[in-house]
């Protein structure tokens, strides 16, 4: 049974709801749910709330019950497989079963190994018809593959061609990255002139881009679980790198790489709002105590040439539940991340200016051949005020998540 026109319409609605979880649901994925009767009467809808709060399915069920609706025999459209494990909240698949839902339409299998097909299997075992978008099961987990393989084709349902599975992955790049690769999706933001300069030779950079681009940059900060920079940027610019120019339900974690713990106690980085995490590789114990006294968490990780081990940083952030990592740093850290192959996506704002001499985006190399250059594909080019916003995705990252090609 393929996605009907109604399924497609309702799944688009569920995905639109899921977008409202941006900046809210981390570390949980962004999920939307719509529940309606067979004749098209909507009973309830919702999206995943803050961690520890209800998931999308629970919100939709509660809304339907609050309106006095009978749920038995209804269909639920969910953008990600209902969870099957006890975490901070009970399993969503059990809630759907208990409510008497007769049919569940899912855009994507959950990449979380604690779920990975188990939610779908439990729904089917309860006699619920389950329809999954065709590309959703590609390359997820062994549990998901086994759950699908063990079901007769007629019970599994079929696809709408993968459109909604892809949309769910796009919306949850960080969650899929953390579940599949054990590290966040790293997005490197850079504002530069047309000739690739991020500042004048003396470091002056305020402001290369216009107000609209700066506001848009804050929206990208908001969607991330953490914003990361390096000690060089703090010492040179004393930034805050919090979310101020757009509304936000919470401030992302601000992460600073400071191998020798040189952050001054007066740094605006340490000021509220929002939590602060500083990664060091040793340093003076008194400085560590001083930073902790300012409210920062200090985590010591293995050192590497030039600073903290970047792979260890990403692994630790993943363990803390960070899905998307937004980086705004200087040329040295930019280059280190690119050379290490850790940049999944470039968020580049280009201003219609030429600076001539100045600071580069990421001075690494020299490369032996052009084939050695990090490979990116343009996925989006859009005008933001007077500036251009360019999104470019690392080819290897896109291939890993099955997201090749333009959006």
Model feature map: region roles:
Residues 23-27, 52-53, 120, 134, ...:
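Proteins enriched for Cys/Gly/acidic motifs involved in redox and nucleic-acid/cofactor modification
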Residues 35-143, 147-163, 281-284, 336-338:
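Zn2+-dependent cytidine deaminase-like catalytic core
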Residues 2-28, 44, 88, 156, ...:
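Enzymes that bind and transform nitrogen-containing heteroaromatic metabolites
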Residues 13, 63, 95, 167-170, ...:
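Generic alpha-helical secondary-structure signal
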Residues 32:
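Helix-turn-helix
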């Amino acid at each position: 049974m393929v996605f009907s026109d109604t399924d497609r319409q309702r799944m688009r609605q569920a995905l639109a709801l899921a977008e409202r979880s941006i900046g809210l649901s981390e570390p949980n994925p962004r999920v939307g749910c719509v529940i309606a009767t067979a004749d098209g009467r909507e009973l309830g809808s919702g999206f995943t709330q803050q961690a520890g709060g209800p998931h999308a399915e629970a919100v939709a069920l509660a809304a339907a019950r609050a309106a006095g609706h009978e749920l038995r025999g209804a269909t639920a459209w969910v953008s990600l497989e209902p969870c099957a494990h006890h975490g901070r909240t009970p399993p969503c698949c059990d809630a759907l079963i208990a409510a008497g839902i007769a049919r569940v339409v899912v855009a994507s299998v959950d990449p979380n190994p604690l779920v990975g097909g188990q939610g779908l299997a439990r729904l089917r075992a309860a006699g619920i018809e389950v329809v999954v978008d065709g590309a959703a099961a590609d390359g997820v987990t062994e549990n998901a593959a086994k759950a699908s393989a063990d079901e007769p084709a007629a019970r599994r349902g079929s696809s709408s061609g993968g459109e909604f599975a892809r949309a769910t992955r796009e919306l949850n790049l960080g969650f899929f990255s953390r579940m599949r690769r054990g590290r966040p999706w790293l997005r490197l933001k850079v504002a530069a002139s047309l000739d690739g300069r991020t500042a004048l030779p003396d470091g002056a950079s305020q402001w290369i881009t216009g107000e609209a681009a700066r506001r848009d940059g804050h929206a990208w900060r908001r969607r991330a679980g953490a914003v990361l920079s390096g000690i060089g940027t703090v010492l040179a610019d004393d930034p805050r790198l919090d979310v101020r120019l757009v509304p936000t339900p919470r401030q992302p974690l601000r992460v600073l790489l400071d191998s020798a713990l040189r952050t001054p106690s007066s740094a605006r980085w340490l000021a509220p709002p929002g939590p602060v995490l500083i990664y060091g590789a040793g340093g003076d114990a008194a400085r560590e105590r001083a930073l902790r006294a300012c409210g920062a968490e200090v985590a010591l990780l293995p050192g590497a040439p030039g600073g903290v081990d970047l792979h260890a940083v990403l692994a630790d952030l993943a363990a803390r539940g960070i899905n998307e990592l937004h980086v705004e740093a200087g040329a040295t850290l930019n280059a280190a991340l690119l050379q290490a192959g850790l940049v999944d996506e470039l968020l580049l704002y280009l201003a219609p200016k030429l600076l001539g001499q100045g600071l580069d985006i990421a001075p690494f190399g020299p490369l032996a051949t052009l084939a050695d250059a990090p490979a990116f594909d343009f996925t989006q080019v859009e005008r933001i005020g007077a500036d251009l916003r360019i999104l470019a995705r690392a080819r290897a990252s896109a291939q890993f998540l099955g997201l090749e090609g333009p959006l």
